[in-house]
Structure formats: structure tokens, C-alpha cells
Regions:
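Substrate-binding cleft of extracellular glycoside hydrolase catalytic domains
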Residues: 92-194
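Acidic (Asp/Glu)-rich catalytic clusters
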Residues: 65-71, 89-106, 140-148, 210-214, ...
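Hydrophobic faces of well-ordered beta-strands that scaffold small-molecule active sites
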Residues: 58, 76-78, 104-108, 151-155, ...
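N-terminal substrate-binding region of glycoside hydrolase catalytic domains
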Residues: 32-135, 265-268, 296-297
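Glycoside hydrolase catalytic-domain groove-lining segments
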Residues: 92-109, 214, 224-268
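Aromatic-lined carbohydrate-recognition surfaces of secreted/lumenal glycan-active proteins
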Residues: 187-206, 257-268, 297
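Aromatic- and acid-rich polysaccharide-binding/catalytic face
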Residues: 73-80, 207-237, 298-300
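Substrate-binding cleft of secreted/luminal carbohydrate-active enzymes
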Residues: 261-338
Length: 338
């Protein structure tokens, strides 16, 4: 790939992060706020035409707006609690996306109508099918339709790991699939140009929850690099490619574009730097993961405690990396790439 093409695709932010990582290219959510925000450089739609090794774009989950004004980011990702959306923040983020010339990804989290957002989860899928959440669907999808740019909608993520965290994550794969299809059918009536993202956690049982090719345009998966867990479970420190490989193999069978929707790295400075270097030196994995289109860094502390004593890992990017991403625009890409 020529330097000129690389500049135009990666943008200044990714090139700046390459420099921070020591590599240069060759040639959450808080119910009180009601919304989370991710900024990405995702280009989720698959390329057409002659097959080639694609350039994986780099994004960042940035709930505190550390890089909100970066010209390097082309997609703004908004987590929306569908039964209690923060309309003020949604309006602000939509406006910011317009101002920055970005597309939108809306991650719709289908909590229940209960005061704790989770009670009645056993009835959630049936209630959706009976139209009891149509008001939420209409509001979200109407807003999506009003946005002038491209919109991606990610509904009910990490559904195949039953837990108390998400009421839609249940041992009811048939109910989930039916609810997903209902949501997409209703939403398409209002926002026919939107694209839909199915986003499992990546476990072996994910295929039971796949709702069908006709309602899935892309697949998202999370990847986490936690140094202490690596050593405890694998006896060594792993890297990005190894951590991604198994999950990628499980979802690539569907032939859809793949997004690392949430990527967090927590550990020593050297551990994090090694992950950054491997992620950003795409020559190491572009051909290994031909369907991979986007990697989105999770730039925040973990909002929930991990089991087995791992606590709440700090996934935030290094200060230097954030500064580089926030402070460089496309006009400075040439100096970084040359």
C-alpha cells in the first residue's frame, strides 16, 4: 500500500498512535447518565471489487470526550438505554457528529421498564414481541432516520453470557433471536438506510443466538488484554492477535464485516505498549483477519468489577497516546507518515 493511501485511510490519529507505540506503518456505562459515548474511525461496510488486504481502522471509546474534536475520527458511537434515553446528551452527540463529519453507531441496550432496569427480564423478549417497547423503538429509530449520515445500530450486545448485568443476556436463545428480528423489522420501517450490528461476547455458544443473515450487517466482539489474568491463566503475557483469534474464528463463519467493538488493555506500561504496537502495525494481522474492519479502544475504567478478584481494570489509553490522537488532524498526517 502506498504512503498516500495509508495516510488517507488511517488518518492522523492512528498515525500518531503508531508513533507513540514505537511503530510506524510500512509504505460503560452509567445508568445515572443514560448514555455512553464511543468515537471510532470505523468503516463497517465491506469493501467491494477486487479482493485485497484491508486497512483496519482505529477507534476509541471516549466517554469523557478526551478526543471529541479530533478530525481523525469518523464515527461517533452512542450507547443508549432505550427505556431511559438521555435526550439532551443524544442531541449534543448527534450535533457533534454533524459538526465533525462523522457517522453514528447507536448501541441500544434493551433494559426492562422496572425501577432497577432488570426485574422482569424473564418477560423481556415476550414483551418486546407484544409491542410493549414499540415506543422506545420508534423514538430511537426515528432519531436515527433524521441523521443525515450513515447510522449503524447495535442491539442487545453480549447476549450469550447470562448474568445479572443485562436482562437480555439469558439462556433463551430463541427468545433473543425473535426479539432481535422484531427490533430490526420495526426499525427498518423508520430507518431503512441504517445497518445492524450483532455483537456477541465471543463464547462457544454464540451461534445459538445468531438471528440470521438478513438482519445482520456486521458483527462486533470485545477483546480485553488484562496482564494479570494472562499470567494467571496462560502462564505468559498474550498479545492482541492471539486474544482476538479464537473469537474471530467463531464469528467469521458468517462472512460479515467484523468489528472489535470494545478493546481494553490493562497492565504495565510495557505490556500496554506491546499491545498498541501490534494493533497499530497492521501488517501483522490484516491478512490473518480479512473480515476485520475496525478496532475500537475502550478509553475508560471498567464500570463493573470482574470476577475472581480482578476488580475493575483501568482500560484507559496512556496519556501520551491520547494527547497524540486528540492533537493531530489530517493536515499533519504527511509529516507523521513520511
Amino acid at each position: 500500500m502506498s504512503t498516500t493511501v495509508l495516510k488517507s485511510v488511517l488518518g492522523a490519529g492512528a498515525l500518531a498512535l503508531l508513533a507513540v507505540a514505537g511503530v510506524m506503518p510500512v509504505g460503560a456505562q452509567d445508568p445515572g447518565n443514560g448514555i455512553d459515548r464511543t468515537l471510532t474511525t470505523a468503516a463497517i461496510a465491506p469493501e467491494t471489487g477486487k479482493p485485497q488486504a484491508r486497512t483496519v481502522e482505529i477507534g476509541v471509546y471516549d466517554p469523557h470526550d478526551a478526543v471529541a474534536d479530533s478530525d481523525a475520527l469518523t464515527l461517533e458511537h452512542v450507547f443508549v438505554y432505550w427505556q431511559k434515553p438521555d435526550r439532551v446528551q443524544i442531541k449534543r452527540k448527534f450535533a457533534n457528529a454533524v459538526r465533525q463529519g462523522r457517522g453514528l453507531m447507536l448501541s441500544v441496550e434493551p433494559y426492562t421498564h422496572a425501577a432497577d432496569w432488570r426485574a422482569g427480564g424473564n418477560r423481556l423478549f415476550a414483551d418486546i414481541g407484544k409491542g410493549r417497547f414499540d415506543r422506545e423503538i420508534v423514538e430511537i429509530c426515528s432519531r436515527a432516520a433524521d441523521f443525515a449520515g450513515q447510522v449503524y445500530i447495535r442491539w442487545g450486545h453480549e447476549m450469550e453470557e447470562p448474568s445479572e448485568r443485562y436482562p437480555w443476556a439469558r439462556r433463551d436463545s430463541e427468545g433473543y433471536k425473535t426479539a432481535f428480528r422484531y427490533f430490526v423489522a420495526k426499525c427498518r420501517e423508520l430507518a431503512p438506510a441504517a445497518r445492524y450490528v450483532w455483537s456477541p461476547k465471543g463464547h462457544r455458544n454464540l451461534s445459538a443466538y445468531y438471528p440470521g443473515d438478513d438482519v445482520v450487517d456486521a458483527i462486533g466482539i470485545p477483546v480485553w488484554g488484562l496482564q494479570k489474568m494472562d499470567v494467571d491463566y496462560w502462564g505468559r503475557e498474550r498479545r492482541f492477535v492471539e486474544a482476538l483469534k479464537e473469537k474471530y474464528q467463531r464469528v467469521s463463519r458468517y462472512g460479515k464485516p467484523v468489528i472489535v467493538a470494545e478493546l481494553g488493555v490493562s497492565g504495565s506500561a510495557d505490556y500496554k505498549r506491546a499491545w498498541y504496537a501490534e494493533i497499530l502495525d497492521q501488517q501483522t494481522y490484516r491478512r490473518t483477519f480479512p473480515l476485520l474492519t475496525t478496532v475500537v479502544f475502550f478509553n475508560d475504567k471498567e464500570p463493573y468489577k470482574w470476577p475472581l478478584g480482578y476488580g475493575a481494570p483501568d482500560w484507559r489509553l496512556d496519556r501520551e497516546a491520547l494527547k497524540a490522537l486528540a492533537g493531530r488532524g489530517p493536515g499533519q498526517a504527511a509529516a507523521l507518515a513520511d
